[in-house]
Amino acid sequence: MDSQRNLFLIAFLFVSFMIWQAWQTDNAPQPLQTQTTQNTTSAAGDAVNQGVPASGQGKTITVKTDVLSLNINTRGGDIDQAQLLTYPDKLGSDQPFLLLESTPGFLYQAQSGLTGRNGPDNPANGARPLYTSGQDHFELANGQGELRIPLTFTAENGVTYTKTFVLKRGEYAIGVDYQINNTTQQPLEVSMFGQLKQTIDLPKHRDTGSSNFALHTFRGAAYSSSETNYEKYKFDTIRDNENLSTTTNNGWVAMLQQYFATAWVPQTAGSNTLYTSNLGNGVAAIGYKSAPVIVAAGSQQQLAATLWVGPEIQDKMAAVAPHLDLTVDYGWLWFISQPLFKLLKFLHGFIGNWGFSIIVITFIVRGIMYPLTKAQYTSMAKMRMLQPKIQAMRERLGDDKQRMSQEMMALYKAEKVNPLGGCLPLVIQMPIFLALYYMLMGSVELRHAPFALWIHDLAAQDPYYILPILMGVTMFFIQKMSPTTVTDPMQQKIMTFMPVIFTVFFLWFPSGLVLYYIVSNLVTILQQQLIYRGLEKRGLHSRDKKKA
């Protein structure tokens, strides 16, 4: 049992270190810049409207659906602000979560337009197009399923550009459609682009304010192309002018943060160039630019894209574009976290409470692992039975480690005992534990999800540290109920303090994760008693003695 505990402590410390290291890799603090970064254009060239003077501010058009509140600037038709109406900014707040923002302290915009030789957003024009609209406010009415916001711009040559935003009830995917009416006698060449730009360094009002690593996930850019399903792109990489430039026939670009994302998905057939760019002043951009489209004289042409602005809801994102659901950051154990989440969501559909769903999933996992757990305790019981022989062997062979090792292996073989048999369930539990951690920290469905009593957010730490203390108590009982062969006083002290060490580690872990571990420990206590009864009948265990 002592080797099992030592392995468990080492494995847990290793997992904790890996969590910390993963956070450091993706979310290391970024130094504040005091001077403007040199503006380096990506290979996409004029796809980015960098440094183009506004030539006067446009009007703000407000748009409201049942889930979104947007501010659209008629200068370029960019979305300057987006609020998620069904997601509060903080637990207990009546303020909706602010995703896109255009203020002096922070910039996060979703831009789109038509560039290229004849595009109205071509930097050579000196200004973004100034659109007009028939009204300043659009709102989705009761019973209405779709809301359309048409913006119109007529160029000096008479060409009319209509930019229409299409929003649907309950949806975070926004259609952005362009209709080009070429009334001239000459063909036009345009390219559609979609771009996300954001201030790299977070101001205080955008920061979570958390000082512990357990509450951070990746914040930065990401993209998908024909060559790669999903690739992160750090803001620091863009700041260092190491820019992305790749051509693909499909894909998307995105900016990510914990629980929420924005993404541009091109919908027009043909190739697109995906790019990143350092826009200067501490602002990074990621976007796409379509291949040139020729609009014949006297004809019309339509171009389209989809903009995702909202929570990272996996099934809805997957319906918008292939692999867009991969933006949910489940870390390197995504292949375990995703099935766990699907099972958890399935259970929640019946139970209606995420906390009780976690309890049920714990019973399911431990039930599946019961044969391994039984084998683990049986192996440890056999190892305890061999302790007198092993101790006699140590006294007889002294410091001859090589011979000691050989005779011990021969003894294990003769007695049909696997010395590592007690470790397998622990090895299996560690990835499940870590995958559950990633699932809790990456699934927006668990953000602000209440359980019971004082636990109002399963994805956040217990504010009163009651669950971690209960977890430590269950570990203490497991330790006291488990036979041990430890005789060294120092090792005994270490074993005694293990529940305390684990309790301290769990203080800052998500409540849902601690809940899982408490229930898992309670199941361990129950299974332990059932298994020990069977071992007693086989003469492999005695309740009267704690030491073999």
Curated annotation (Swiss-Prot):
It is a multi-pass membrane protein. Residues 30-53 are annotated as: Disordered. InterPro entries: Membr_insert_YidC, Membr_insert_YidC_N, YidC/ALB3/OXA1/COX18, YidC/Oxa/ALB_C, YidC_ALB_C, YidC_periplasmic_sf. CDD domains: 5TM_YidC_Alb3, EcYidC-like_peri. One of its GO terms (biological process) is protein insertion into membrane. Pfam families: 60KD_IMP, YidC_periplas. Its main location: membrane. One of its GO terms (molecular function) is membrane insertase activity. Required for the insertion and/or proper folding and/or complex formation of integral membrane proteins into the membrane. Involved in integration of membrane proteins that insert both dependently and independently of the Sec translocase complex, as well as at least some lipoproteins. Aids folding of multispanning membrane proteins. Belongs to the OXA1/ALB3/YidC family. Type 1 subfamily. Interacts with the Sec translocase complex via SecD. Specifically interacts with transmembrane segments of nascent integral membrane proteins during membrane integration. This is Membrane protein insertase YidC. It comes from Erwinia tasmaniensis (strain DSM 17950 / CFBP 7177 / CIP 109463 / NCPPB 4357 / Et1/99).
